[in-house]
Amino acid sequence: MRPEVEQELAHTLLVELLAYQFASPVRWIETQDVILAEQRTERIVEIGPADTLGGMARRTLASKYEAYDAATSVQRQILCYNKDAKEIYYDVDPVEEEPEATEPAPSATPAAPAAAPAAGAPPPPPSAGPAASVEDIPVTAVDILRTLVAQKLKKSLADVPLSKAIKDLVGGKSTLQNEILGDLGKEFGSTPEKPEDVPLDELGASMQATFNGQLGKQSSSLIARMVSSKMPGGFNITSVRKYLETRWGLGSGRQDGVLLLALTMEPAARLGSEVDAKAYLDDVTNKYAASAGVNLSAPVAGGDSGGAGGGMVMDPAAIDALTKDQRALFKQQLEIIARYLKMDLRGGEKAHVISQETQKALQAQLDLWQAEHGDFYASGIEPSFDQLKARVYDSSWNWARQDALSMYYDIIFGRLQVVDREIVSQCIRIMNRSNPLLLDFMQYHIDNCPTERGETYQLAKELGQQLIENCREVLEVAPVYKDVAVPTGPQTTIDARGNISYKETPRTSARKLEHYVKHMAEGGPISEYSNRTKVQNDLKSVYKLIRKQHRLSKSSQLQFDALYKDVVHALGMNESQIIPQENGHSKKGGRSAAKRNTPTRPGKVETIPFLHLKKKTEHGWDYNKKLTGIYLNVTESAAKDGLSFQGKNVLMTGAGAGSIGAEVLQGLISGGAQVIVTTSRFSREVTEYYQAMYARYGARGSQLVVVPFNQGSKQDVEALVEYIYDTKKGLGWDLDFVVPFAAIPENGREIDSIDSKSELAHRIMLTNLLRLLGSVKTQKQAHGFETRPAQVILPLSPNHGTFGNDGLYSESKLALETLFNRWYSENWGHYLTICGAVIGWTRGTGLMSGNNMVAEGVEKLGVRTFSQQEMAFNLLGLMSPAIVNLCQLDPVFADLNGGLQFIPDLKGLMTKLRTDIMETSDVRQAVMKETAIEHNIVNGEDSGVLYKKVIAEPRANIKFEFPNLPDWEKEVKPLNENLKGMVNLDKVVVVTGFSEVGPWGNSRTRWEMESKGKFSLEGCVEMAWIMGLIKHHNGPLKGQAYSGWVDAKTGEPVDDKDVKPKYEKHILEHTGIRLIEPELFKGYDPKKKQLLQEIVIQEDLEPFEASKETAEEFKREHGDKVEIFEIPESGEYTVRLCKGATMLIPKALQFDRLVAGQVPTGWDASRYGIPDDIISQVDPVTLFVLVCTAEAMLSAGVTDPYEFYKYVHLSEVGNCIGSGIGGTHRLRGMYKDRFLDKPLQKDILQESFINTMSAWVNMLLLSSTGPIKTPVGCCATAVESVDIGYETIVEGKARVCFVGGFDDFQEEGSYEFANMKATSNAEDEFAHGRTPQEMSRPTTTTRAGFMESQGCGMQLIMTAQLALDMGVPIHGIIALTTTATDKIGRSVRSVPAPGQGVLTTARENPGKFPSPLLDIKYRRRQLDLRKKQINEWQEAELLYLQEEAEAMKAQSDETFNEAEYMQERAQHIEREAIRQEKDAQYSLGNNFWKQDSRIAPLRGAMATWGLTVDDIDVASFHGTSTVANDKNESDVICQQMKHLGRSKGNAVMGIFQKYLTGHPKGAAGAWMFNGCLQVLDSGLVPGNRNADNVDKVMEKFDYIVYPSRSIQTDGVKAFSVTSFGFGQKGAQVIGIHPKYLYATLDQAQYEAYKTKVEARQKKAYRYFHNGLINNSIFVAKSKAPYEDEQQSKVFLNPDYRVSVDKKTSELKFSTTAPEAKQSESTRQTLESLAKANATENSKIGVDVEHIDSVNIENETFVERNFTQSEQDYCRKAASPQSSFAGRWSAKEAVFKSLGVSSKGAGAALKDIEIGVDANGAPVVNLHGAAAAAAKQAGVKQVSVSISHSDSQAVAVAVSQF
C-alpha cells in the first residue's frame, strides 16, 4: 500500500475514532459499576499525567462500595503511575535485619530501617548521624507556579493538573484569577501576555528562561508566614531547613521543593511540639520524594566503621562523676544567694510539715462528723435558698382573658358541648378573676359572635352571656375557692388476662362536695356506739361505791368523783372510753363487737363523723361535738358558697406536684391568697409547674412566690423567713398561715437500720419545722405583729408506729403534738396558733400511691379514704375564719382520718387484701397462658396472630404544603359581592413564598416549635437532615439494596420512625437559644474573649528568627528599639526587641454574654447543594441568603428561577434584601485578622459589603436586570425591605421582588451590645435560676435585655395579577407598609428611639361624619360610573376611527398602510381603555385614602378590602425583651387602636416570637412576618411560652392580650407586624388573608387559579423531596438564559420571554425577536367597522361591555333580557359569563344602530334576539316592539359582529335602511 494511501486511511481512522469518542456518552458510572461490582477488581492502575480517574474511583468506592467491600472482605488498591511507580512495579526498598536482642553489639547501634516513600518517618534516634545527601536540584518555575495556584485554590497539587490554564481552574471567578495573577507578578517580576489562558506547563516553561531557581517574594512570604503561624515556638525557618538537611540530606533546592509542597498541606492549627513539627516535615518530605522520584536514605548510623559524624556512648556513672563537683558548686552558690536574700530554702518543706499536721486534725474532725451523720445527711443540709431565684406570679388579669378566649374557641370547635363540671369550674376560675378589662373583652366577643355559622357559635353566645352576667355580679366580691369537681372513689379491677388496673371513679353516693360533707358528718357503722350502754355500766360502778362510802377513806372519795366525771364524759360520747370497750377484747372492730357487749335494749346509737375536731381533756384529746359542728358547718358553707382567702399571706412547704399541698395551694390562690411556696428541686420544670398552676387558678389579688428551699438547712429556714418579712429586699409580708408539709420518705427502715437519711428526715419534719415556727415568731415579735397570729397547720399522722418500717417518721409526727402543750407553756401564743391535722389515707400521693390498689378493699370495711382534692378541701376548711378564731382561743386538733383508727391491725388487713389481689391476678394470668398454649396446639402456632394487639407506629410523612385554599361557597362568595373587581390587581402586592434560616432550622420547623412547643416526627427528620445527623442512601448497604435514611457517622440504616427517639435530645440541645458553641464561631469562647493590651518592654528580649522582609518591617516600626542581623547560613534574620519597644499582648476577658440564638449545630450550606468553592469564598451570611432564596422560591412552587421570565421581563425581577451589618465574618477578617497579619483572601472587602449577598443571589440564581435596593435598618431591616419592595412593585419598577433581611452573630457586636446594656447578661440570668431557653422573656416582669441571634428571613412578593397568572400560592396580601422616624434627641441623644413615630400610621383628622370613601358600596358606584364613561369613550373612539384613517390617508403619501394604521389605533384604544379602567380601580380601590388627611393610612388600607381596624386580629411585636421596648411598643399599638376607634374590649392577640428565636437584628421582621403568614393559614395564634408573669405595667394596654400558649381561632383576617431598629427606624406592615383577594375574582377565575396551584404544589413537593435525597434544593445556574450575542437585544426589548428549549429542556430566550401581539378581537371589530362604512344607507352602533358587568346570577335580569334559546346557547359556552356579556353588548349595539327612541335604561332587551347561523356567526332577530320600531324607521336589515378580549366584549351592529 502506498504511503499516501496509508496516510489518508490513518487520517480517516483518527477522525472517525475522535468522532465516535465525542459523540458517544462517557458512561463512567456504568463503567465503574462493571469494574468494581461485576468484576470485583481489586487493583486499578491509572496511566496518565495526573490522578484523575483514580480519584473518581476512590470517591465511587467511598460512596457506594465501602460497606459492600467490608462485608465481602474485598481490599482494593487504586494506584497512579506518576506517584505510585514503586508499588506498581513492586519495587520495595530493602530493609536491613536487626541483630537479635540477646546479643547486642556494644560498639554500635542498629541501623534504622529505611523509610517507606509515602509514610511519615519517626524522629531519628539520638545517636543517628546525618542522612546521605541527595543530589540537589533547584526548583523550577512550574513548581512555584503550580504551588501558588494550588495554595490559592486551597487544593492539593494532584488536583491542579498542568494541562489546564488558570482561567479553567478558577471556574470563572474573576477576583480569584486576579489574585493569582497578582501573586505571579510579585513572584516572577513579569509574566507573559494573557497568562490566564495558557496551560500551566506551557506558562511555566515560558517563565523558566528568566527564572533564577530561587524562591521569589510571594513564595518566600507564604513560607515564612506558614512557619511562624503553624510551627511551634522556636522552631523557625532555619530550624526547618537544618532539619531537612540533617534528617534527609536535602540541599537548599530540594528544601525549597519540600517547603513549596508544605504550602499545599498546611496544618489546620499550630503544631503543639517540636516532635509534631518534625513528624509533619517527614510526611511532607516523603510525599515530595514520591512525586519527585527521589530515593531518600535513612540517617547513617555510627558504629565500628567510624562513619562521619558517628556517635559515642558514655557510661552514665562516668558522666555523674564528671559533673559532681559542678553540682556541688551550684548548690553552694544557691545557698549563699538565699542567705543574701534572707530566704529560707527549707521554708516550704517546714510549712508543708505544719500544714500536714493541721490537715490531719481537720480530717479527723471531718471523719468524725461524717461517721456520725453520714453522707446523706451531709448533702441534705446544704442550703439552697436564694432570693434572686424567686419567681413571682401575679398577672391573673392577663390569664383571665386568655382562659376566656380559650374557652370561647373550645365551645366553637365543639370541645365543650354541655355545661359539665369542667365548664362550671372554668367559669368559677374566670369569675374569680373578674375585672372591667375582662368584662369588656368578653362582651365584645359575645356581641360579635357570628351565630349564623352554626350551633356551636349560638351555644358560645348563650354561655358567654351568662358568664358575663355572673362576672358582673362578683365584680366587687372577694374571690373564693369553690371546688365543683365530682368526688371520686378508688376502683381496682382485674381483667381476664390478669392485668391489674386502678382508677378513680365518681362516687354514686356523692355527686358534689355538699354530699361529701354530709357523708363525712354522718360517719359510718364502724364509728357507731351506744351512749345508754356506757351510762348504765358506769352508773353500776357508782352505785357500788355509794353503798361502800361509809367504809371508804378520803382517797376513795376522790375515786368517786373521778368516776362521776367519767359518766358525764360518757354522756358526751367520750371516744377514749369507746375504743377499749369495743375493741379491747377482740381484733374484729366495727358493729359486731359492739353488739356482743350491749344489752337487749341498745339505747340511742350515735356516730363520730369521719372528719371531726377534738378538745383537750385530762384524758387526752377527745371528740368534741360542738367544735366538730362548727367545722362541718364551715365545710358545708365552703362547698356551697366557697371560701375566700383574700388578703391572707401564706407560707407553704411540701407542695410538690401530686401532693396534698399542691391541691391546698390551688385552693389558696383560687381564694385570692398571697402564697410563698418552697421547692427543694428548683428547676425550669418545677417553676413551669407552679406558673401553670397560677395561670389556671390564680384569682384576682392573689400572688404566688416560688423560692428554692431546703428545710434540712438551718440557714435556709432563717433566710426564708427573713425574706418574707424584709420590707426592702424581700416581700414585706406578715404571715397569716404556715403550712409546713415538707417531708421525705423513710420506707424500709426498722429500728436497727436508722441511718443518715432517717436523721435528715427527722431534722426536716421536726427539728427545722420547729425552727421555722420559731423564726416566724421572732420576726413577728421584731415587727410588733402581736394582733395577727399565724395559724400553723401541723401535718400530723395516725401512724404512731402502726405500719412500721418507716424509720423516724412516726416519731417526727408524734413529737409535733407537743406543740399543743407548748402553746400554753411558752410565750409565743400571741404570734402563732396551732391547728394539728391528722391526715387520713390520701390516695395518689407520693407516700400512698403504692397502696392505691387496696384502697377499695379498705373502704369496704366502712372507713373512708380520700382523694387529694377531698383532703385539700378538708384542710382548707381548717383555714376558714371560724376555725382560725377557735385556734386563737386554744389549739385545735382535727382528726381527718376517715375512721381508720377504728380498724385494728390495719397493716395485716392491707397485706391480706394485697395478697388476694395478686393471687387472683396470678391465677388469671396462668389460666390465660394455659388457654393460649392449648389454642396454639389445636389451631397452630400462627392462629393467634389475628387476636394479638399490634401497635402501628406512624411513618414520617414530610409534606410540602401550600396554604389552604378557601372554599368558594362558604368563605369567598360572601365577600365577592362587595369586592369583585374593586382593586387593580397589578397594584396589589402579595406574598407568594417565604423562608428562613435560623436557630430552629427553617420556617417549617420553627413554626412547629413556635405553635406546638415540640417537634413532630416529620420535624425531627427534617432537623436531623439539616444538622447532618442523617443522610439519604440509595444503593447496596451490607450486601442488600437499601433506600432510606442512614446515620451520617456510622452509615447504619435509620428507620424514619426511629429518628425522633434517637436524635431528638441532641436536636433540642443544639438548636434554638443556647450556650454559645465555639465551633460555630471559629473558636470564639465568651469565657475567654481575647483582647490585646499594649505594653512597653523593660528589658531586652531574647532574639528570634524571621525572614528578611519581616525583619525589615519590625525595624521600620520600632526603629532603634529593635536589632536585626542576617544569618549567613540561611539568609534569614535574627530579631531582638530592645528595652522601650512596644508589644500587643493577648489577654482573655471573662465575658458575661454566654448565650445566643444560633443556627443548628451541623448546619451546612453544601447539604442544600451550594458548591464548596462558593462556600469557601463568601461570608457565612451569604450562604444563609442563598439557601433562603432557594427555599422562598420553592415555597412559591418555583423550581426554576428562569420560570419568572416566562411571565415578566428580566428587568421586572427585583432584589430588596438588606442587613443591619452585612458580612460580619469578612468584616472581622478585614479589620482584625488583617491587623494581625493572618492569611486572608484578597477580595475580602467585596464580601463584606451588604449588597454583595444580593449580588450572589443574582449571579447564582436569577440573572435578572431588575431593581436592586439594599435597605440598612438595623433591627428593622426586614420590614423596611418589605416597604421598599412594596413600593417598587406598586410604582411599576418591578413585578417580582425578593425582600427580607439577614445578620450574623459575632463576638464584636455582642461585646458592644453588652456595653450598651441592651442584651441579656447570662451570668445574672444563671444567678436568677434561668436556663438559656428562658433568657428571652418579652413582656414579663423580669425581662432583662434582648438575646442576640443569627440568620436570614425572606419573602417572595409579586403583583396579585402575576401570582394568579403563574398559579403560585398566595400566603397573604400586603395591605400597607410604612416606616417612620422619631423626635429630636436633644435632651437624650438616644439612637435606639422609643418608636413613637410609628403612631403616624394611624394619623387622621376626620370630620364629624366618616368619609364616604370608606364605604365600599359608595366606591363601587363611583367605579361603575367611571367604567361606563370609559366604555362610552371607547365606543366613540372606535366610531371615529374610520374618519381618522381617511384624514391620515389624505395627508400621507401612497405608502400609507391604512389597515396597519387602523390595527394599531384600535389596539391603542383597547389598551388605553384597559389602562383607564385600571387607573379607576386603583384610585377608587387601592389608593383612594392616600393624601387624604381625613383617612388614616391604616384605616384606608383595611377599607380597601372592606375591613376595619376591628378586623386586625393579631399583632406581632418586635418584643425584644428589653424593659423599654416592650412597654413602648405596646403603648404605640394601643394608641393606634384607640385613635382609630377600635371597639372597646376588642384586644389584639400579641405574638412575641423572640422568646423562641432571639433577636437576629436584620432578619427579625422577616421571621415575624413569616410567622404571621403561618397564623393566617392555620388560624392558630402562638403564645409566648416564656411569659411566666406579664408585667403589671402592661395591664393598662387594654387593646392587647398577651397569650402564653397557642390558641386555635376560627380564622384570622388581618395582622400587624411592627419592627424597630437603631437609627430611629420604626416600621409597620399590615397583612390580610388571601381570601379577600380571591373575592375580587369571579368563580371561574378562582377555580382556574386553584387548578394551577394544585399542579404547582405537586411539582414543588417532588422537587423538595428530591432535594432532601440528593442535597440539591439549591441548584446554581451556570449561565444566563440567553446567549452572549443576544444580551443587548433581550435587555432592550421588554417583550422578550423564555420558552422551553426542545433539545435541552431548559428555559431559554428564543434567538428570534418576539412578534408584536395581534389582537383577534381588534381585528374582528375593524372588519365589522370597515364593512359598515362601505355600505351606503346604513347606521352603525358600537357597544363595549365589561365581561363581569353582566350579572348572570340574577335570574330576573336574565329572564327579562334573554330568550330561552339565547340562555341555552350561552350556558353551554366555555365561559358563560363572556357569552352573556357578548350577547348583551350585541343587543345594545343593535339598539344604537336602529336609531330609535329609548324607553329608558331599565327597558328589557328580550325583543332583540341574537341567534347564530349555520356557521356560528351571530344573527339578529327582532321581535315585538323592537321589530315594530325598526319597521317604522325603515330598517331593512340588521347585522352584528361580536368580539371578546380578556376583560371586555365589543359589538358592532349595522342597520341598513
Swiss-Prot record:
Keyword terms: Fatty acid biosynthesis, Fatty acid metabolism, Lipid biosynthesis, Lipid metabolism, Magnesium, Metal-binding, Multifunctional enzyme, NAD, NADP, Oxidoreductase, Phosphopantetheine, Phosphoprotein, Transferase
Binding residue positions for acetyl-CoA: 1743-1745, 1769, 1779, 1788-1798, 1812-1815, 1842-1844
Region (Disordered): 96-132, 577-604
Molecular-function annotations in GO: 3-oxoacyl-[acyl-carrier-protein] reductase (NADPH) activity; 3-oxoacyl-[acyl-carrier-protein] synthase activity; fatty acid synthase activity; fatty-acyl-CoA synthase activity; holo-[acyl-carrier-protein] synthase activity; magnesium ion binding
Catalytic function, reaction form: acetyl-CoA + n malonyl-CoA + 2n NADPH + 4n H(+) = a long-chain-acyl-CoA + n CoA + n CO2 + 2n NADP(+); a fatty acyl-[ACP] + malonyl-[ACP] + H(+) = a 3-oxoacyl-[ACP] + holo-[ACP] + CO2; a (3R)-hydroxyacyl-[ACP] + NADP(+) = a 3-oxoacyl-[ACP] + NADPH + H(+)
PROSITE patterns, A to Z: CARRIER (PS50075), KS3_1 (PS00606), KS3_2 (PS52004), PHOSPHOPANTETHEINE (PS00012)
Stored InterPro entries: 4-PPantetheinyl_Trfase_dom, 4-PPantetheinyl_Trfase_dom_sf, ACPS, Acyl_Trfase/lysoPLipase, Fas_alpha_ACP, FAS_alpha_su_C, FAS_alpha_yeast, FASI_helical
GO biological process, one term: long-chain fatty acid biosynthetic process
Catalytic residues identified in the record: 1275, 1518, 1559
Domain Ketosynthase family 3 (KS3): 1092-1633
EC number of the protein: 2.3.1.86, 1.1.1.100, 2.3.1.41
Residues of the Carrier domain: 139-214
O-(pantetheine 4'-phosphoryl)serine: modified positions: 174
Known role: Fatty acid synthetase catalyzes the formation of long-chain fatty acids from acetyl-CoA, malonyl-CoA and NADPH. The alpha subunit contains domains for: acyl carrier protein, 3-oxoacyl-[acyl-carrier-protein] reductase, and 3-oxoacyl-[acyl-carrier-protein] synthase.
Family: Belongs to the thiolase-like superfamily. Fungal fatty acid synthetase subunit alpha family.
HAMAP family in the record: AcpS
Protein name as catalogued: Fatty acid synthase subunit alpha
Species the sequence originates in: Penicillium patulum
Organism phylogeny: Eukaryota, Fungi, Dikarya, Ascomycota, Pezizomycotina
